Amino acid sequence: MEDIYELYSRGCALLADGHHHQAAVPLSRARDLSPQSASIREALGRALFHTQRFREAAAEFQAVVDQAPTNDYALFCLGRCLQLLGRHAEARVPLAMAASLCPKRTDYALYRDRAAAAVEPAHAKPDDH
């Protein structure tokens, strides 16, 4: 049986070196062995995000948020995944929460505002002229 810490460490090293596809392999194994570990799931979410597997990444970040509802980074990443899946209305809540938790993070506010702007035209009423 593989050691969870070894898998996690190897995955994080690959992630740090920009080898996102390769990082997903040991991180997925580590997650399967320790599904309750927020740090493993966050790292796996990052690897999946960078390989444009946004649906899978969103599931990992959602698992982190379920355990730690005030984890601003996981909220932000969840929101970004939802945006990139075209689910702007759903992205608004986690992005707004992340921006509220860390008001100095201008990137959080930027993507929160973009999600809101993407939704607004869909809800705008046509002029009665």
PLM-predicted stretches and their roles:
Residues 1-6, 126-128:
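TPR-adjacent "capping" and linker segments in tetratricopeptide-repeat scaffold/adaptor proteins
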